[in-house]
């Protein structure tokens, strides 16, 4: 049933439509009018809202969401109004208005065309203010969800009930969003408007307002909804391969942003039968994305199931899919083929190279690549296996070879392999290029014959061509470079007439450093023209060139200053400076003056223009009428074109004051016999040197036959005086300051007959003397010819002195300057490492030595200033010996030498940074461990300072206070505080522990070095731990810097007559009979073993070096076993100390024995060795003497040795080898007064002044039969060696030999008793060669 109100509204609406329709084509409708004017109106809560709408047509109300039209509070009445009731009015009444009624109230016509909608609606925003409710909607407990889209507008609808309320927008947890009027806008009728929402606005947002001191909040939770699909994948490899009957499992993974839902479906070949089962799940553990899984499973796959499997993912309008193909096979198989050809090529230096094969197989086989029959990935870390490919990183020449791929399916017993050959081509390399790259080129003497070499290597073998690039003959200002002018380069051959005359160009293949290289030699027959020789090596990979600056010089060393003569006052000073024009420029003369201890450079005015010649530039300096003030140091300065360095050549000029001549002695009358000869001397001094003129009877004497004027005419010599020669002789000396003269009368006696007789006698005498001299010359030549035929392989001091004298041996040794000569300019001398009686050793930096492209630290031996010719000859002889010996790892090797004139003689050898072995072992006494396990488990502890190191010294520097050097043996070491700081980088090395394996290794290496020296027929004669240097990587090297050893200050060398000798290390035959051989070196090696296994102890501790020591040594008494020795090591020592040199082992045998011991030690790690002196009570600290080993020796309880074991528990050692029946060996320790006392190993090692020169030689008597030395394991003492250096003073012979003081020798016995008492103390006549010929050990 329709009410009247509804009927009226309906009729009004119809009428309005008619009116609006009519008015649309005619007059325009006016907007409805509201009774409240403006855009907003504020009222208080609880009041009644009256609002009337007047319009020209029927209209309706639009109200806020919280105002319900069915509410009893709301009433709307409609009526006709206006003139004649032609207008429509509607009155809205809202009783007791509430805060949530706040909003837009609008009135609009019922039927309005879309285009006129805005014009037919009127609205006003009503604020219903309530102090207890500032927000229209309150969500204080549960936040309101707001959906948002990134990039679009987001409205936070925290509307307020009064426009005057201040609202703050906050984002959990601590952010505050402040309106900026652009991106974030506050509107009291809408809330906060964010124009371009991002992910940052996702989360909990809170609007806060404070009213009357009370805080109100309303919460909103933004929710981003998206349909984005990030990625879709099938985790199974593509394509999928299966055997028939197996199960197929495909996992499809879809990744989406948060708040996204997807639909995942599958399509597959046999989908109609629905054989597949699908499981789905979602992983939301990721904070940034959702991961959806769909797993498809098909059991018992058949051939009909092969084909394409597709996974489709849809989210709203977004769609993605992924597919894979499935292959079904009946059985396993492998097929492999070459991808290209069997022989492959690549280039060295390539970042990576992929070696791959075409492989089809199922199931996936195991892949192994072999290189030359060995697993490639185990051979080098640069080989990586990727699928069926082998990746070679950073290709090198060593990567060439045969590569085999092994494919295997072991479960199906299917195997296949295929081999390919890889050739690695190498760009040519010229090995001389590194040396020729130095900025300062070489100079070649004018007219000399020169040989230029170019050695190239590459794969394939490169071809070498020579080119000539001439220098501009007018060149004077610029350097002659390949690019400095535009002159053409000419290819050379043997018949070329370009440049210098070519004698030959040859090429040959040579194996150098294990590689087959092409060596080309260009021989210049006559060096006349300066230019650049260019060596070009090329192959298919590339081309490389080497420029050889060939500068001709007519000046020695390219720079020379010449003084015509030293002028006197008033004369002219004439100097000339000549430099090579291609190497130097800006030539000028300067005068050097010293002012306030500073050298000042003063230019010299009025210098002449330089004269440019074909090869050089000459600048002359002439100072006319010099005075004494012109004395000084004149220097020619020139700038090196290549280095830019200014070079000075100095000449000291001393102007002498003029002095009138004066005679040193006047002439005196004298009488001579006829036919004899006479000489008249007239020596005069003066400045300048006076000119002498001779007169006879006032007539000037000229030189003629029979009358000879000596140098400067100061001597007049008359041959066969005749009667006519009698008269007055007058000499006159004249210079600018005056003249002086003297005269004498010469009387001639005798007759002509007598003179004829004298002439005949003189003639016969001359003939006889000539014949005698001729016969003597022939005899000497015959003797030299026979001696020169002696074989030269027995060289140096090792040659039998009875065959050829030592000096003659050394003179025969050749010195190859082309191989060993090193430019002094490339050698930078550093700190002094040590000095000796007449030589010194300095540390230096050598650039390019041994063709190395880098700077290398070396040791340089040189003479001190003022060295004599014999000392120079000694060092040169030593250099020749070094060149003869050759190279070996365990010998300090020669690197080069500087022998050319213009500088000091220098011998360059290897530098060993860790010093000598003796000092090193002493520093390790608190860090010695029997095996590596103990060393690895030791507790870290603060390193204890040695005595003497507490005052600011480092533990490393024990050689600072020692007479022994860390760089060589025996010389005094120069160390400053800065030197100490430079050695701090080695502290870590000195803190590392040392084990039994290290001691055996040192012994083994020294034996190897001595084996090498003995093979070169070299005898060391001073083999000791002080002459063993420790290099990097625990390598020891034998050395003996003989010229630098100051044996006069080293207590290891005992004076014997006028010579000091290392007696403790010398074999008996060397002491008594002066016999040196390889077997005497073996004796010294045994003493060296004793030093090593006593950790640097001094041999024969507590034993005086006197005649009693000689006698005991001759009787077979030997040293006890050292503290850290094993029975096998001690047996080796005793073998080396055999009385008969022939019974001592050869060094080759020692290498074999120690090699076996070293290998055994590595395998057993030291656990099965029993140190001989380890038979001590672990905690008592006392030393016991024990009997020799017996059968039940090892049944006794033995306490652990005093090694650092890394544990506080007692450790016992059990030997792993059998002992022979051992004879008893007498030891020196048994004779000492207090056998159990602790000896200081730093007593003077050799401290006895033995015999005077009057005692001629020792006596050696073989009164007892020879017996083989066996081990006696009787331990008589355990001396704890300690201290830093040899500090005690040398002691002297016992009273039985007579006491000898340093100042004066006094003997208390008469000669007969003396000869009987000290027959053992006579020195050999001369041991100077020990000093002269050493380093490396000879």
From Swiss-Prot:
Glycans are attached at residues 100, 164, 196, 251, 323, 402, 417, 474, 547, 597, 620, 625, 666. The keyword Ubl conjugation applies. Residues 959-971 have a biased composition (Polar residues). Residues 1-26 form the signal peptide. The modification Phosphotyrosine is found at residues 914, 1053, 1169, 1213, 1242, 1309, 1327, 1333. Changing residue 1333 to F: Loss of phosphorylation site. Abolishes interaction with CBL. Present in an inactive conformation in the absence of bound ligand. Binding of VEGFA, VEGFB or PGF leads to dimerization and activation by autophosphorylation on tyrosine residues. The second and third Ig-like C2-type (immunoglobulin-like) domains are sufficient for VEGFA binding. It is linked to Can contribute to cancer cell survival, proliferation, migration, and invasion, and tumor angiogenesis and metastasis. May contribute to cancer pathogenesis by promoting inflammatory responses and recruitment of tumor-infiltrating macrophages. Abnormally high expression of soluble isoforms (isoform 2, isoform 3 or isoform 4) may be a cause of preeclampsia. This is Vascular endothelial growth factor receptor 1. The lineage of its organism: Eukaryota, Metazoa, Chordata, Craniata, Vertebrata. The gene is FLT1.
């Amino acid at each position: 049933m329709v009410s009247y109100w509804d009927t009226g509204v309906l009729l009004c609406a119809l009428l309005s439509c008619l009116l609006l329709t009519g008015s649309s084509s005619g007059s325009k409708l006016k907007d409805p009018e509201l009774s409240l004017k403006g855009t907003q109106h504020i009222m208080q809560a609880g009041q009644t809202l009256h609002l009337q709408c007047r319009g020209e047509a029927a209209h309706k109300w639009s109200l806020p969401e919280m105002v319900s039209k069915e509410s009893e509070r709301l009433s709307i009445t409609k009526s006709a109004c206006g003139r004649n009731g032609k207008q429509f009015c509607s009155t809205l009444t809202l009783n007791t208005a509430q805060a949530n009624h706040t909003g837009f109230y609008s009135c609009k016509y019922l039927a309005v065309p879309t285009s006129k909608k805005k014009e037919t609606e009127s609205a006003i925003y009503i604020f219903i203010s309530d102090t207890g409710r500032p927000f229209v909607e309150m969500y204080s407990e549960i936040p309101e969800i707001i959906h948002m889209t990134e990039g679009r507008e987001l409205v936070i609808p925290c509307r307020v009930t009064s426009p005057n309320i201040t609202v703050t927008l906050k984002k959990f947890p601590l952010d505050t969003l402040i309106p900026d009027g652009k991106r974030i806008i506050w509107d009291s009728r809408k809330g906060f408007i964010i124009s371009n929402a991002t992910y940052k606005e996702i989360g909990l947002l809170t609007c806060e307002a404070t009213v009357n001191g009370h805080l109100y909040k309303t919460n909103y939770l933004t929710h981003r909804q998206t349909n984005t699909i990030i990625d879709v994948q099938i985790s199974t490899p593509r394509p999928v391969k299966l055997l028939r009957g197996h199960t197929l499992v495909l996992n499809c993974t879809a990744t989406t942003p948060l708040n996204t839902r997807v639909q995942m479906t599958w399509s597959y070949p046999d989908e109609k039968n629905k054989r597949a089962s699908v499981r789905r799940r979602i992983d939301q553990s990721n904070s940034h994305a959702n991961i959806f899984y769909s797993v498809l499973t098909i059991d018992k796959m058949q051939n009909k199931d092969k084909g394409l499997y597709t996974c489709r993912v849809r989210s709203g309008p977004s769609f993605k899919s992924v597919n894979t193909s499935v292959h079904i096979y009946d059985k396993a198989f492998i097929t492999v083929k070459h991808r290209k050809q069997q022989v492959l090529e690549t280039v060295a230096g390539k970042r990576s190279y992929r070696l791959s094969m075409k492989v089809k197989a199922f199931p996936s086989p195991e892949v192994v690549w072999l290189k030359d029959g060995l697993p490639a990935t185990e051979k080098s870390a640069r080989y990586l296996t990727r699928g069926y490919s082998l990746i070679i990183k950073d290709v090198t020449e060593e990567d060439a070879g045969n590569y085999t791929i092994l494919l295997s399916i072991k479960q199906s017993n299917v195997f296949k392999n295929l081999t390919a050959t890889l050739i690695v081509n190498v760009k040519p390399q010229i090995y001389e290029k590194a040396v020729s790259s130095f900025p300062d080129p070489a100079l070649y003497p004018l007219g000399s014959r020169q040989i230029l070499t170019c050695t190239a290597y590459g794969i394939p073998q490169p071809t070498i061509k020579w080119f000539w690039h001439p220098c501009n003959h007018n060149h004077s200002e610029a350097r002659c470079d390949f690019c400095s002018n535009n002159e053409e380069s000419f290819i050379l051959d043997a018949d070329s007439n370009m440049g210098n005359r070519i004698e030959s160009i040859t090429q040959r293949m040579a194996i150098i450093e294990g590689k087959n290289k092409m060596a080309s030699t260009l021989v210049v027959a006559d060096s006349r023209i300066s230019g650049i020789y260019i060596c070009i090596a090329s192959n298919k990979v590339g081309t490389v060139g080497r420029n050889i600056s060939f500068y001709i010089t007519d000046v020695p060393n390219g720079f020379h200053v010449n003084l015509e003569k030293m002028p006197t006052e008033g004369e002219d000073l004439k100097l000339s400076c000549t430099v090579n024009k291609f190497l130097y420029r800006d030539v000028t003369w300067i005068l050097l003056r010293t002012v306030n201890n500073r050298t000042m450079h003063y230019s010299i005015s009025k210098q002449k223009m330089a004269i440019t010649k074909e090869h050089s530039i000459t600048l002359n300096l002439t100072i006319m009428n010099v005075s004494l003030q012109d004395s000084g140091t004149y220097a020619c300065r020139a700038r090196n074109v290549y280095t830019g360095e200014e070079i000075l050549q100095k000449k000291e000029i001393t102007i002498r004051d003029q002095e009138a001549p004066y005679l040193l002695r006047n002439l005196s009358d004298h009488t001579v016999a006829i036919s004899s000869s006479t000489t008249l001397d007239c020596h005069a001094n003066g400045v300048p040197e006076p000119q002498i003129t001779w007169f006879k009877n006032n007539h000037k004497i000229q030189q003629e036959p029979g009358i000879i004027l000596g140098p400067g005419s100061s001597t007049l010599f008359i041959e066969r005086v005749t009667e006519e020669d009698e008269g007055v002789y007058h000499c006159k000396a004249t210079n600018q300051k005056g003249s002086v003269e003297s005269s004498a009368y010469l009387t001639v006696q005798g007759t002509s007959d007598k003179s004829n007789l004298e002439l005949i006698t003189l003639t016969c005498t001359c003939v006889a003397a000539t014949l005698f001299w001729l016969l003597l010359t022939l005899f000497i030549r015959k003797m030299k010819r026979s001696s020169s035929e002696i074989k030269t392989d027995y060289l140096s001091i090792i040659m039998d002195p009875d065959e050829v004298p030592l000096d003659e041996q050394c003179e025969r040794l050749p010195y190859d300057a082309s191989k060993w000569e090193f430019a002094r300019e490339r050698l930078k001398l550093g700190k002094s490492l040590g000095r000796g009686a007449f030589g010194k050793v300095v540390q230096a930096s050598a650039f390019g030595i041994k063709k190395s492209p880098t700077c290398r630290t070396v040791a340089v031996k040189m003479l001190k200033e003022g060295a004599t010719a014999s000392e120079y000859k000694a060092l040169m002889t030593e250099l020749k010996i070094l060149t003869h010996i050759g190279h070996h790892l365990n010998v300090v090797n020669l690197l080069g030498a500087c022998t050319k004139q213009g500088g000091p003689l220098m011998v360059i050898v290897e530098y060993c940074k860790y010093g000598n072995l003796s000092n090193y072992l002493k520093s390790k006494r608190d860090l010695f461990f029997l095996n590596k396990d103990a060393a690895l488990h030791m507790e870290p502890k603060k390193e204890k300072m040695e005595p003497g190191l507490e005052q600011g010294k480092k533990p490393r520097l024990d050689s600072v206070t020692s007479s022994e050097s860390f760089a060589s043996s025996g010389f005094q070491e120069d160390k400053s505080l800065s030197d100490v700081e430079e050695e701090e980088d080695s502290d870590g090395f000195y803190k590392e522990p040392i084990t039994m394996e290290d001691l055996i290794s040192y012994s083994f290496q020294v034996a190897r070095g001595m084996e090498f020296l003995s093979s070169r027929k070299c005898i060391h004669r001073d083999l000791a731990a002080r002459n063993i240097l420790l290099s990097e990587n625990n390598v020891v090297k034998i050395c003996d810097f003989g010229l630098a050893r100051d044996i006069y200050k080293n207590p290891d060398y005992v004076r014997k007559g006028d010579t000091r000798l290392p007696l403790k290390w010398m074999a008996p035959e060397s002491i008594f009979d002066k016999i040196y051989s390889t077997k005497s070196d073996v004796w010294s090696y045994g003493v060296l073993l004793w030093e090593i296994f006593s950790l640097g102890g001094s041999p024969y501790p507590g034993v005086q070096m006197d005649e009693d020591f000689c006698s005991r040594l001759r009787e077979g008494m030997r040293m006890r076993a050292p503290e850290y020795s094993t029975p096998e090591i001690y047996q080796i020592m005793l073998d080396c100390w055999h009385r008969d040199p022939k019974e001592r082992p050869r060094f080759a045998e020692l290498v074999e024995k120690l090699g076996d011991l070293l290998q055994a030690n590595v395998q057993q790690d030291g656990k099965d060795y029993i140190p001989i002196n380890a038979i001590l009570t672990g905690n008592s600290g006392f030393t016991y003497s024990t009997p020799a080993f017996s059968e039940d020796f090892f049944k006794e309880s033995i306490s652990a040795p005093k090694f650092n074991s890394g544990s506080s528990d007692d450790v016992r050692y059990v030997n792993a080898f059998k002992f022979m029946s051992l004879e008893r060996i007498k030891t020196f320790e048994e004779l000492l007064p207090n056998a159990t006392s602790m000896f200081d190993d730093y007593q003077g090692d050799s401290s006895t002044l033995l015999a005077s020169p009057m005692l001629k030689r020792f006596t050696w008597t073989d009164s007892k039969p020879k017996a083989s030395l066996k081990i006696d394991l009787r331990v008589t003492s355990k001396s704890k060696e300690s201290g830093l250096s040899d500090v005690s003073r040398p002691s002297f012979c016992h009273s039985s030999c007579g006491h000898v003081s340093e100042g004066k020798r006094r003997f208390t016995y008469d000669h007969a008793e003396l000869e009987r008492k000290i027959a053992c103390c006579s020195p050999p006549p001369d041991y100077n060669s020990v000093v002269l010929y050493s380093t490396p050990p000879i």
